[in-house]
């Protein structure tokens, strides 16, 4: 049963919806608390009853945007899928959702990219949470013999670099038409089939040599 909303909760939700509309329409740079108060039909002083600062409001917008992506991560990690399938779904479901958001409204998507750049300290906690859940999947994979010789932190760093375009909305936005879940599946297969600490000869022992 859903928890009954207080007047404060309802007011915060209504203001958040207005703020999301404003961000999606024209980004966050020109936004002021006075303007939002005017749009909401209240005084600026009253607005501060619901959000104590502009930063608190941006934090609520970030939480609103990330909430469904966090739910995806939680559900995938809690599933009984094998590690390879689990890692694919961990990325694929979030990518599919973000791609649909981009297809629905590229301008709004770009506004969220800019919001993330302007307020990266608000985004960092969600990046860290993603690494936490990825570490859990990597740990399961290592228990089955994958990623031999690597520490969990090393594996996280490498996998983040390999899969970055599928979760980093700034990078994703630039090449979205070239990204697909089919390509992602091949990437995850390559990660599981080859990622380890073993030196297979790619790095020369005596520096670069001319062709």
Predicted segments — roles?
Residues 1-26, 30-39, 56-59:
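Basic, helix-initiating cap at the start of DNA-binding domains
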Residues 2, 89, 132-143, 161-211:
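C-terminal peripheral helix-coil segments that are non-catalytic and often amphipathic
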Residues 11, 54, 61, 65, ...:
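Hydrophobic/aromatic residues within well-ordered alpha-helical segments
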Residues 40-51:
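Short hydrophobic/aromatic patch on the recognition helix
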Residues 60, 64, 74-100, 156-159, ...:
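Hydrophobic alpha-helical connector segments
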Residues 67-70, 97, 117-144, 153-158, ...:
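Amphipathic alpha-helical packing segments from all-alpha helical-bundle domains
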Residues 86, 98-118, 135, 168-171:
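Amphipathic alpha-helical segments used for helix-helix packing
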